[in-house]
Amino acid sequence: MTPYYEDSAVQIYHGDCREILPTIHADRMITDPVWPNADPRLAGSSDPAGLLRSALSVANCKTVVLQLGRCSDPRILAAVPDKWPFLCVSWLRYAVPSYRGRVLNDADVAYAFGDAVASAAGRRVVPGTCMSTRGEFLRGHGRNRTSQQFQETQDAMPHPAPRHLKHVRWLVQWFSDEGETVVDPFCGTGTTVLAAKGANRKAVGIEIEERYCELAARRLAQGVMF
């Protein structure tokens, strides 16, 4: 299959990850999957657990890291097969939080399954917290007082679920080793592959929506963070 975008470190494929994953090699998976109460604009939002279960059933990697928002329904984690035992949970905090109704949206959460990275000086134990001071896609105002205000700013974003590059860089650093290949089967606008490339990893991104493939390719080609 011909990549939608390719450079010396990254390949992006436009298509269904369930069809593409069996054809590629990757050491670690770091992704932000479609979750049960996801924005309906996201492909796969009608059956997120089924989508994740199907994708993981054809994946062959040592580690799976799933990043979820604080308001994302975590029951999707039941879709992770037993062949990847639970490893740890990490908190990806925001220095400037927002509000979603009654909930203070001050962190994402990452769940890791499978093998830890190789033990080395400075990497004997895996920490559990990362702090990010800003996002790469600016929302216009950081403190959304109501669910309606939150949704209005989300609707104006290039992607319904952007993640902070610093958070994903941290996940790449602590859940993969230099020189390995990281795959993101729900690539979106390419934050994971951008983070992996910057950390001397190879990366493969898979995205079913061509408009997001285009944005990811543009970010990589221009070397931009937004």
Question: Could you describe each region identified by the protein language model?
Answer:
Residues 45-96:
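Conserved Class I SAM-dependent methyltransferase catalytic core
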Residues 34, 68-71, 186:
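Short strand-turn motif at the edge of the Rossmann-like AdoMet-binding core
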Residues 3-12:
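Beta-strand-turn-beta hairpins that frame and shape the catalytic cleft
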Residues 24-30, 40, 80-226:
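Class I S-adenosyl-L-methionine
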Residues 1-3, 32:
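Short, charged N-terminal beta->alpha structural module
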Residues 37-44:
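Conserved ATPase-coupling elements of RecA-like P-loop NTPase cores
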Residues 14-19:
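Conserved SAM/SAH-binding loop
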